[in-house]
Amino acid sequence: MDCIEVRGFYSSTEEQNPEQQADISENISSLFSLKEQQKMSEYSGLASNHSQMIAEDSEIQPKPEHSPEVLQEDIEMSSGSSGNDFSGNETNENYSSGHDSHGHESDENGKDSAMLMESSDCHKSSSSNAFSLMIANSEHNQSSSGCSSEQSTKAKTQKELLKTLQELKAHLPAEKRIKGKSSVLTTLKYALKSIKQVKANEEYYQLLMINESQPSGLNVSSYTVEEVETITSEYIMKNADMFAVAVSLITGKIVYISDQAAAILRCKRSYFKNAKFVELLAPQDVSVFYTSTTPYRLPSWNICSRAESSTQDCMEEKSFFCRISAGKERENEICYHPFRMTPYLIKVQDPEVAEDQLCCVLLAEKVHSGYEAPRIPPDKRIFTTTHTPTCLFQDVDERAVPLLGYLPQDLIGTPVLVHLHPNDRPLMLAIHKKILQYGGQPFDYSPIRFCTRNGDYITMDTSWSSFINPWSRKVSFIIGRHKVRTGPLNEDVFAAPNYTEDRILHPSVQEITEQIYRLLLQPVHNSGSSGYGSLGSNGSHEHLMSVASSSDSTGNNNDDTQKDKTISQDARKVKTKGQHIFTENKGKLEYKREPSAEKQNGPGGQVKDVIGKDTTATAAPKNVATEELAWKEQPVYSYQQISCLDSVIRYLESCNVPGTAKRKCEPSSSVNSSVHEQKASVNAIQPLGDSTVLKSSGKSSGPPVVGAHLTSLALPGKPESVVSLTSQCSYSSTIVHVGDKKPQPELEMIEDGPSGAEVLDTQLPAPPPSSTHVNQEKESFKKLGLTKEVLAVHTQKEEQSFLNKFKEIKRFNIFQSHCNYYLQDKPKGRPGERGGRGQRNGTSGMDQPWKKSGKNRKSKRIKPQESSDSTTSGTKFPHRFPLQGLNTTAWSPSDTSQASYSAMSFPTVMPAYPLPVFPAAAGTVPPAPETSVSGFNQLPDSGNTCSMQPSQFSAPLMTPVVALVLPNYVYPEMNNSLPQTLYHSQANFPTHPAFSSQTVFPAQPPFTTPSPFPQQAFFPMQPFHYNPPAEIEKVPVTETRNEPSRSCTPQSVGPQDQASPPLFQSRCSSPLNLLQLEENTKTVESGAPAGLHGALNEEGTIGKIMTTDAGSGKGSLPAESPMDAQNSDALSMSSVLLDILLQEDACSGTGSASSGSGVSAAAESLGSGSNGCDMSGSRTGSSETSHTSKYFGSIDSSENHHKTKMKAEIEESEHFIKYVLQDPIWLLMANTDDTVMMTYQLPSRDLETVLKEDKLKLKQMQKLQPKFTEDQKRELIEVHPWIQQGGLPKTVANSECIFCEDNIQSNFYTSYDEEIHEMDLNEMIEDSGENNLVPLSQVNEEQT
């Protein structure tokens, strides 16, 4: 056995005297030197050669018997556990590794290696000999033959080998050492790994440069080495701890390094010659260096070398941190210092190579401990970190480097708890519980101790926050803002730690981490916004959420949690049981549960209450608490959530589904009738009911409960793109007009219901529980939460499956209640109206309005306003009933913006006169007299912002200004300085629903501010003669505001109207009237510059009244006499009035939802005034004035049947046409010329402003004019000889910097800033003797 022979050899050498041992060593060396001449092909004979070698060696010396003691010593010397005793254990480790590298040529070798690795002691006397034997054998594998006289050389080689190995061991990271000592095997493996990594990176770098053809080098400046030295010297000369180095991105070698580097890195300057920069880096930082110096990511040096750029600006480029070797502090131990590296991309002209080589210039600044002089001030010792729910560092602020001693790459991806003091780790669980409780809001907690790199602890005060995923409402990551309170004992945080043992995860660390992870799986139920940009970060969202949450939850969070739990269980049951049954049961259950007071609110409120009660009754086990949190959050809506919800709804609406399926909703009465049945089965159905409740209730509608199994939601196209998470305020921007796939009816129902109620609820954060109506309204918000769940479905596949069921339930239950509720002309943001929802549910005609014939019908949702509650302050709103045939969307709360009380538009209204407000007319005309007329006297009840008494009309012409307006035009904003005008004849308006047939409005007194309305006399007072059918019981109350109101026309709304249906965008009462309105608008516009335009359509329907800000004209056109409208057929008469009222109501209700964006309308109606609508105060803001919005879109005003679907975007008009052909209502619309449609969407622009902007852009572009090359100049001279005489301006032809002082000549550049068309060559160039020079513009044309 080879192993026995080796041991015999070891024992024999031990027994020899020193002289004999020396001879033996020489003989062995000579044998191995001969073996070095063997070729690599002899590997196959390694085992036999090895045996032969041992035999030969043993023949030289007599073979004594193997002493067990000596054998044991020899074996023990190879333990490898002793890092310091290199000659012993390391030698044997090399021996074993050498054989391992060759695959253990023989079993004996393998056994021998195993035996050698077992022992723990070393024998120094024999280790050197054994080392030489093993090194030669393992490295060279040569046969045993011949001798050599190179003993001295071999001895030196052995010493060098030992020294190199010791130095190599110094590079081994502490975490790879065993008990603080480096083993040879581990060191060699680590060295091999590092070499491979460096080589791979170099190859990748070269491949990258070849493949990309140096794309980033196109605009990179080229410098010589001397120029690089000159440029960088100005940055480093003032800082003794800073040096500059240029590294070739092709070869990785140092092209240039500043003189300071030798002093800072404590080495000779010659050391850097032809050296690769990565060789100076700590092995663990090599990958960071390569990643951070990717060519296409580097900024070009000329970016920061401009005169206007300061040194500080350049240093603020993205930097990274690396450790660079800086000599040896102790023998065999390399010292690394951290440096902040700021990279730039340049080209360096290499004299040895023809082409310039792409290089990276690095400004390296040594980083010192923040606790050593010059110290970082205590109040500046602040840094931030983020970590994941699994407690792994995700990001570390670079400010932490001098404070913690760790580089960012050292911490990222490592457990947070490992770096904390063991006694402080349990605090992290409590902190994360509070994070979940605060829902993104920052908070402070008790200090924690953090271990720095040198092993000492610092004490930090931390402000914790989190980012809440707006889709799943779960914590995405946790943010900590740390301030160091107490520094470490050892101020040098970069010093090596005193201990070397590995940081092994303590069992408590793993346990706490798991608890935190499970905790953060729960959705955040708190409505608070994320302090760092998650939901509600805009502030207004937070307010909305907080308000809604307080009232929705009714202060009982437990109920919500229980609801959520039940919901999760119900979701599973829903799968097993019929969805329809489930939804029906749910609807009944909801109704029954709803308290009588909430019944008043209507199905929306009922559902909410029912859910609360039902879910509490059926509270699920506590293990569902996490789910509850998810659901709970939903009742509280942020703008962002609502927007997402709206987008989903629009997506569903866009799907091609029969209108009947979409509109199918049972009357609220039917729901009530089924209440008893449902109640009977409440217990059995509870899980289902809960799930239904979930679907119907806002809370339950929140993101699916953790652990709840959800089926995938089959949605067309791009549900995930429904909304931008950041577009929280821009409601219209979130609207998505989606494709043609057929959505499921329930989805569509959801979309419809929420569209009205959602917008309402979201728009109006319910006012404080001062009024039950407000609370009820907030409950509606909860229902909207169901749609929010739909959003969650997009991001969570498990939720998708649940949504399908949810959609059905929502459609039948919530949707019915919502539909009834919305159809009943609930003002979009009025909490009080919710109180009347229950009553409205019973109103007849609900079904009809809900049926939608338009397949593409898109209900416009109003952007949730800041807080409807704040505006309404708990006031009651008159009950509004939907008109039969009226577009459902128009009646949706979003449509009936708080501005529903806005000025009522009358066909013959004088454009410039403010309209009287009818106190009771908050809603549009009810479809039938049966609808209780809120009555003019009900104005106070309406609780609308219209607090004015019937006699008092607050803002003349503000929103109330009425004019027959062609949808195309924007009208000038009414002067808010105008005095409030009162109609003295207001008494003429009877409180009873019907208008007196001959009611006449007395002439309006002239406005105090004549400037906006100079032609007031021009408009004679025209009495309104209305003989409305008895069915018209309500007249919208027109509330004027003192503030000027900009009509909420789609134009004024801007992009927001894009969400509205095509008809609404067209702003035509019917498709037939589109062209007529177009013509009328033209005539009216030409007739007068008046800001108000009125026109009657042929059918006698009064054009929608709208006031818009016109940049210029303030005059108003006289409207056609009211008699014309009256002369039209009876249907047209009622329809006209209906249209006006509906228009008034819907537009105001929508807050220009149709006119601009249903979403923006909400904001406008809530008083944001974004549209210029004066909605904030009265909610009747200019949204009323945007009469052109929805009802212009309504299809047939004469029939009063508005079966239109809002067109979300003009770009989708083609998509819209696809469905238009399927519905007769849209046939005419489909054939309408695109130019006509476009006319209604062009925003007004100030000519002067536009020209000014264009001129500014032209000036900027002028400086970027191309310059001629020499070849081009020669060609031009051949064609245009005058150019050679200096006719071409230098601004065009000059190839040098025209801004340099040396190049500026007299008046060459004086005219450079002038418009191009104004520049003439005669003025710009010196006399060239050429009298026929052409203007520069002409020259430019020739050049092009």
UniProtKB/Swiss-Prot annotation:
Gene name in the database record: PER2
InterPro entries found in the cross-reference section: PAS, PAS-like_dom_sf, PAS_fold_3, Per1-3_PAS-A, Period_circadian-like_C, Period_circadian_regulator
Biased composition (Low complexity): 78-89, 549-559, 1149-1172
Ranges where the PAC domain occurs: 445-488
Protein name: Period circadian protein homolog 2
Organism: Gallus gallus
Motif (Nuclear localization signal): 851-865
Keywords for this protein: Biological rhythms, Cytoplasm, Nucleus, Repeat, Transcription, Transcription regulation
Region (Disordered): 1-21, 42-112, 531-609, 661-686, 823-894, 1038-1065, 1107-1126, 1149-1197
Motif (LXXLL): 358-362, 1138-1142
GO annotation, cellular component aspect: cytoplasm; nucleus
Subunit: Component of the circadian clock oscillator which includes the CRY proteins, CLOCK or NPAS2, BMAL1 or BMAL2, CSNK1E, and the PER proteins. Interacts directly with PER3, and through a C-terminal domain, with CRY1 and CRY2.
A GO BP annotation: circadian rhythm
Lineage start: Eukaryota, Metazoa, Chordata, Craniata, Vertebrata
Lineage: superkingdom: Eukaryota
Compartments it resides in: Nucleus; Cytoplasm
Cross-referenced CDD domains: PAS (cd00130)
Chief localisation class: nucleus
